[in-house]
Amino acid sequence: MHMSKSFLLISMGLASISVHAQTLTRDNGAPVGDNQNSITAGENGSVLLQDVHLIQKLQRFARERIPERVVHARGTGAHGEFVVSGDFSDLTLSSPFAQSGKVTPVFVRFSTVIHSKGSPETLRDPRGFATKFYTDQGNWDLVGNNLPVFFIRDSIKFPDMVHSLKPSPVTNLQDPNRFFDFFSSQPSATNMLTWVYTNLGTPASYRTMDGFGVHAYKWINRKGEVNYVKFHWKSQQGVKSLRPAEVTKVQGEDFNHLTNDLYTQINAGNFPKWDLYVKVLSPKALSKLDYNGLDATKVWLDVPEKKVGTMTLNRVPDNFFLETEQSAFAPSNIIPGIEPSEDRLLQGRLFAYADTQLYRLGANLFQLPVNSPKSPVANHNQDGPSNNSTGLGNVDSLDVNYEPSRLVNLTVDKQARAVETPLSGHVQQQAIRNPRDFFQAGVLYRSLSEQDKADLIHNLSGDLNKVNDAEVKAIMVSYFYRADKEYGTRLAKATDVNLKQVTKLASM
């Protein structure tokens, strides 16, 4: 009797499910008759080409992947909001900073830089920290890293640098012989290499790392006055990194630790927060620095910061592919009141990042919800694959796809014009003057605790000891010696490089 009652309950449950279940369909909306068996010519006959459901499933499966990002391939996204902490309209007319308490929705994508999508998140690497602000002036992307500087200062070296850091085209393995061969002729990398080989190169979580805009940008107010700014996200959770032994332990237990931690904490209601700070310099003050303030390999030392707002991440994406994977960030996505500086690396990124997103996602990438502005879009960009918008907004005539027109009145916003900038000099192709490649690496080294110094030497010598070319190894050690004699001496000992050779190279 008990079994009969159970059977009856199960039968009723199945009947209930079948009544309320949604019908499986093909992409054209037609219902599917059988999703377990292909159509065949008899029990043991061939599968028929007319099985359009089977064909469509296989076709769609073969086309699920889009091109992987050439850098920043492995990423984790989250939604949130930015709240400005004051009225900074005296510095910029950009809307996120113009009214105290204003709330701007954001989407953030954290990432590793060099390694591929399936790589462990424990690997040493800078970490991407890209923030998309959905403002009422359009989307603004602040595309930065967890470290304040970069390896190179000119975008013409970017493809070479990435090639050297990526796996070998022969073995498909990342090889210190390759990237130190490249860096041995790039003394500008000394500062960034010091940063990335500290424990900051292996963060304990995305929540416990800072973010930096790296480059100088321009803020312009309504009077047309220009100031240079650098952006800094400060984690309210504090900065925590993994020491060498911890990296090995964590990788063996969970090589997705950064993503797991972020999503677990957000889903538990422990929303991570970052305060946004800016350093501000007038053009005159920038010109008086004893190093090039537009050099992406430098931080602005001894320039005070001011807090301008707080970001809170409070929602995990509903679908990884639709949001995180298809999110497209580019420094060229700017709004009135913010302009790029003359930083040579930034100038190249303005083109390269936008172009790689067009390659990955197509010309209509801004129609994807995660990239779509919250503000109205009205222009005459048209057609292309997967277009589902006229792009014209609430205009009177869809027949007019040009401007100017007497039939449709599209206006421009004069405050969005490029700020007038004086130019002088001659067209040239030369390195910057006064590069000062080594001194900030020394400042960083001397600021570290003894434990952090020891970990830096351990981390850096571990990769340098894999280099087969003795000259490359000696040159690299000489760069760090020029940054700080103690730094170079300890590194020479850890790598069995002759200190006399190092000092000779350092004096050249």
From Swiss-Prot:
Residues 373-396 are annotated as: Disordered. GO terms for cellular component: cytoplasm; periplasmic space. The keyword Oxidoreductase applies. One of its GO terms (biological process) is hydrogen peroxide catabolic process. Gene3D superfamilies: Catalase core domain. One of its GO terms (molecular function) is catalase activity. It catalyses: 2 H2O2 = O2 + 2 H2O. Its cofactor is heme. Its EC number is 1.11.1.6. It is found in: Periplasm. Residues 1-21 form the signal peptide. Heme binds at Y353. Residues 373-392 have a biased composition (Polar residues). Keywords: Heme, Hydrogen peroxide, Iron, Metal-binding, Oxidoreductase, Periplasm, Peroxidase, Signal. Its main location: periplasm. It comes from the Bacteria. Decomposes hydrogen peroxide into water and oxygen; serves to protect cells from the toxic effects of hydrogen peroxide. Belongs to the catalase family. This is Catalase. It comes from Vibrio vulnificus (strain CMCP6).
